[in-house]
Amino acid sequence: MSICKEKNGARNENAGAAEYRNIIAVTNRKLCERPFFEQVERICQMHPKALILREKDLSESAYEAMAGQVLEICGRYDTPCMLHSFVEVARRLHHPYIHLPLFLLEEYCGKLNDFRIVGSSIHSPEEAVRAQKAGATYVTAGHVYVTDCKKGLPPRGLEFLKEVCTKVTIPVYAIGGIHAGTGQIQEVMDCGASGGCIMSEMMKI
């Protein structure tokens, strides 16, 4: 299942969508230069493929309060929103899109039938296979390029990404050191990925 498929059909596209339609925005409120919800709305106005609300350091109650507001903003722009880690929050909000670290995905294996889209973060071809077996409908794979988020750690590179893409039949999204407008999105798609994920840049656009 593609992460960009919506129950009510195709999304409208405009000039912003033409640039961002293959980009998944990943949030990190600590990087914002403006109020967080204002930044989320700004991102949605660019019509990315989806948004992952990653603020997993929050308490469950704080995350739920934030998620309710973010889902309302995303809904106004028809931007798919993946909640992150908090499965029960997603259920209480009747939201069928969730993204989980691999260890949580495997813990919940067989217990996520009420979710339409289930993503997972992986860091090796073997983990990608495990994620698909555990029920993931897409994976994010990284880190592909040099990134400040992983200072001192060498990137896994495009050959890693190619191998991941050959090991699974679900969509793969590259993550790590990706910037819009640099040709990197096309580069990762040429490796077989369905697009790329961007955090830092999307928190500052």
Label the model's feature ranges.
Residues 102-110, 140-152, 177-180, 185-205:
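Glycine-rich phosphate-binding active-site loops on the catalytic face of alpha/beta enzymes
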Residues 40-47, 75-76, 91, 110-113, ...:
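Acidic (Asp/Glu)-rich catalytic clusters
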